[in-house]
Regions:
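Small/polar residue-rich beta-strand/coil "junction" motifs that cap repeat-based extracellular fibers
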Residues: 76, 154, 206-209, 231, ...
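Structural signature of tandem-repeat unit edges
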Residues: 15, 38, 42-71, 78-97, ...
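A generic structural signal for ordered secondary structure
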Residues: 28, 32, 40, 103, ...
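Flexible coil/linker segments and helix-coil junctions enriched in charged and small residues
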Residues: 22, 26, 190, 235-237
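Intrinsic-disorder/low-complexity detector
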Residues: 1-47
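Leucine-rich repeat
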Residues: 130-132
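C-terminal capping region of solenoid repeat domains
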Residues: 235-268
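Consensus positions within tandem repeat domains that build extended binding/scaffold surfaces
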Residues: 74-76, 99-101, 125-128, 152-154, ...
Length: 268
């Protein structure tokens, strides 16, 4: 196990973290950290600590990192370039106050798959995504392999991707707040696959926040239509979207004028 100690990297910056009254500190490593490929660490796992932030790094293999002691990410990967197109990750802890596990990520491949395994997660936190190398193109696949207990701003400010595919089971989620919060996203598509909201008791209706125009949202799974109908009937944020809800092979599209779901076709 590799432990990253003080002064082992070129620069270490300490600054107070005050979000939500949290006055603890986090480390910021900048410049020269290249995933161990040039410092002889490439054969061992790199241990990450709670609150650590890696900035401006080239990440060749995210699976080489040990997240076992990380409880709050705090923009853990800030403006990092990711070179592989497949990751099988496992996070443990409460990520609600992270400010983003990945912040301004830059993918070197146009089509990236992230398999994100949730274990003991109360809140997933956020991906702040910017595909700087391939703007407005590519597809991000994110699979949540365990049930989400509390969803809070999972994806935010998705400038870079033409399509986001999110696979997950939200049937036991006790609350929703801004699962997607985006700006500058005209012409994009997000696909919610198996978006099962389960029992509506104690559910927060603010599922999406700051929604820009021309998103196509495809919802599949067992989501109660009534929940999304209330969202769409708001009339200020949702009914400019092309909503599609899939139930089995039936494909239902919400008519914002008639304010009702219309059977629009069948999936193969």
């Amino acid at each position: 196990m590799i432990k990253i100690e003080k002064n082992t990297l070129q620069q270490e910056v300490w600054f107070p973290r005050t979000e939500r009254g949290n006055n603890t500190f986090r480390k910021t490593y900048q410049d020269g950290f290249d995933d161990g490929y040039q410092d002889g660490l490439s054969s061992s796992k790199i241990k990450l600590y709670d609150g650590m932030q890696l900035a401006y790094s080239d990440i060749y293999d995210l699976n080489r990192y040990d997240f076992s002691d990380v409880k709050s990410g705090g923009n853990m990967f800030y403006n990092c370039r990711f070179y592989n197109d497949y990751y099988d990750l496992s996070f443990v802890g409460d990520w609600n106050d992270t400010g983003g596990i990945f912040s301004r990520i830059r993918l070197k491949n146009r089509d990236t798959t992230m398999i994100v395994k949730l274990r003991e997660i109360r809140s997933f936190g956020a991906f702040y995504v910017v595909d700087a190398d391939y703007p407005n193109s590519g597809t991000l696949h994110c699979t949540l392999t365990e049930k989400v207990k509390d969803a809070y701003m999972m994806f935010s400010y998705n400038y870079g991707f033409g399509t986001i595919n999110l696979y997950g089971d939200f049937s036991e989620c006790t609350g929703f707040r801004e699962i997607v919060n985006w700006i500058n996203s005209d012409g994009k598509t997000i696909n919610f696959n198996h978006f099962d909201m389960g029992n509506e008791t104690n559910k927060t209706e603010d599922v999406f926040g700051n929604t820009s125009k021309n998103w196509t949202i495809r919802i599949s799974g067992n989501s109660p239509r009534s929940t999304f109908t209330r969202l769409l009937d708001d009339g200020t944020r949702y009914n400019h979207l092309d909503w599609t809800y899939c139930y089995g092979k039936e494909r239902w599209t919400y008519d914002a004028v008639k304010k009702e779901w219309v059977l629009s076709g069948y999936d193969d």
